[in-house]
Design a protein with these regions (language model features):
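A secondary-structure boundary/capping signal
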Residues: 6-7, 36-37, 106, 126
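Alpha-helix capping/helix-boundary segments
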Residues: 9-10, 40, 109-110
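Short N-terminal binding/cap micro-motifs at the start of the first secondary-structure element
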Residues: 12-14
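Acidic, PIN/NYN-like endoribonuclease modules and their adjacent C-terminal/linker elements
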Residues: 108-133
């Protein structure tokens, strides 16, 4: 299954002390396909470096980029579906183009997608995603 993982959810999943660590372990084990773009990788890098450390950021990004279950997407169109936080659109664009089953997020800005009769991308929390794994 193709998924897009919001940055805050990635940060929660990479901590071995967090209840969502299994999401990261299942990614490493190849149980789902993580869809990314260059913009998403840049955000992952910046936020992990700022919140944890540059060394951890390098380790995590290298781990992501070296996995076979990563699908790199090059969006050719920006849909601009989220107006409340334009920066979140990179995740939506990736999910639409990758035909992802889910965007895994806790960000309420993505809830607008539930009301758009456009190409349906389901929004799911880490807890619900973990239950599916």
């Amino acid at each position: 299954m193709n998924i897009v993982l919001d940055t805050n959810c990635l940060i929660m999943a990479i901590s071995a002390q967090n209840e969502y660590y299994k999401v990261w372990q299942d990614f490493i084990d190849g149980k789902y396909i993580l869809c990314i773009t260059n913009d998403i990788i840049e955000e992952y890098t910046e936020v992990i470096a700022r919140n944890l450390s540059p060394l951890i950021s390098d380790y995590i990004i290298t781990a992501i980029l070296n996995r076979k279950n990563v699908r790199r997407i090059s969006p050719t169109y920006a849909f601009h579906l989220i107006e409340a936080d334009e920066d979140d659109n990179k995740f939506v664009d990736c999910a639409i183009i990758a035909n992802a089953k889910y965007i895994v997020t806790h960000d309420h800005h993505f809830n607008i997608l539930k009301q758009i009769p456009f190409r349906k991308v389901d929004i799911i929390t880490l807890k619900k995603f973990l239950e599916e794994l």
